[in-house]
Amino acid sequence: MLAHLTGVRGSVMLLAHGNMRVSHVSTHVALEDVPKRLTPERLRMVIDLTNDALLRLGIARPKIAIAALNPHAGEGGLFGRQDIDVSAPTIAKAVADGLDVVGPVPGDTIFVKLRAGQYDAAVAMYHDQGHIPVKLLGFQVDPATGRWQELSGVNITLGLPIIRTSVDHGTAFDIAGKGIANEHSLIEAIDYAERLSAGVSASKS
């Protein structure tokens, strides 16, 4: 909706918590539709917007890893050819254009390496592939009561002519006004907005 209202061709969702920064090729679509959303044009847009965001955050030479769509990056075509026919050539073109991009990296190892600091960001192919690792680290629940104890993480929309960040959780209207809301995600969202704004100002000076 924000892309439509601001007149841009497309936007990208980036989730962030600590050094876990994950942008997405697709988000709210059925799994059966994900392969159709993975096109060279869309993947390159996600790579470019992610790289731009990292530069604005003060990372001089961003390193971005691209997650594989299929198990074991397709296992040489045994489990699908999208990683071979779409992702690999797009990554190669980005590298030829001077970007530091690697992949496709199998989805079962890419986020371990991201958390360890081997990459500055990762590109996930679909919603749950990117959301699960970020929320696994940013969300904590009380095992006895099932209540959320910590909700950390930021949802950032890339590609807009404005800076847009938000908390990485729902509206929680059920606890509004009770004095028990967790503020961590909101503070992170404000911090990211400030840092992105500073990056924009620096690029224009």
Task: Explain the meaning of each model-derived region.
Residues M1-Q82, P89-S205:
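Anion-binding alpha/beta catalytic cores of soluble intermediary-metabolism enzymes, centered on
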